[in-house]
Amino acid sequence: VSRRAAFALIVCTLALSGCLTGKRPHLSAATVPQAGTPVGDPAIDAVLGKLDAVTAGPATAVYEVLTKYGNTTNPAAVALDPGKRNVTIANARFLQTESLAITCSVDGSTGCVDGFDVQRVSNVGITPDFYASDTAKRLRRDAQAKVGPAVARTDVIAQQPATCVDLPVPNGTAVYCVLDNGLIAVLDDGDVRIQLTAFGATVDPTAFVQPA
């Protein structure tokens, strides 16, 4: 092998994705529609419109979250009341009221800290906003990446009517379902599967009590 060919091989190895597969597609923030902006596909916009107008409560939703990398399952729950929310994911608790925003542990094993420490749930693959706004972000990204027409449908999830859309994307089919009140009912993409298991249009006031 000539010295020039060997050098070219080294360069190609260091930039493997560029030499073998071409430049990877990248969606910049500028190309993804902002929150509240329709994407122009009626099937997708029907779901986005509800996610963007999620209820302020009262509402309580319970979920099961499958993180596909590692195949681990964790519980999650959302309690909403106007001006307040309590979100639990695995052993992390995110509490927000009119006067505070803190992160605690569900079992009390660690103390509370000011603000939302999303690193506590980084291994789960979702954030405290998973129940609406973060799912809307995912859907807008998938809307840009879809490789075929989106399919609209309806479903009944946890005994609640849901509006759904299935999107063919490069790694399979992404599924999004939302309740009429804007809470996510199902999200199934390449990273996670979030499944609503119970819903109630009431909330326990103790959900918003700060731990002693």
Functional labels for PLM-detected ranges:
Residues R153-P211:
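Gly/Pro-enriched, hydrophobic low-complexity segments
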Residues G18-L20, T103-S105, G111-V113, T163-V165, ...:
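Sequence contexts marking disulfide-bonded cysteines in secreted/extracellular proteins
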Residues A8, A15, L100, G108-S109, ...:
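Secretory pathway export signals and precursors
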Residues A53, P75-D81, R93-L95, V147-V156, ...:
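Short, exposed beta-strand/loop patches in secreted or surface proteins that constitute
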Residues S2-K84, T206, Q210-A212:
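N-terminal leader/targeting segments and the immediate start of mature chains
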Residues K137-V151:
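A short, amphipathic edge element
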Residues A56-E64, D81-T88, I157-D166, N181-V186:
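Short, hydrophobic/aromatic-rich segments at coil-to-beta transitions
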Residues T73-S133, V192-T197:
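An acidic-aromatic
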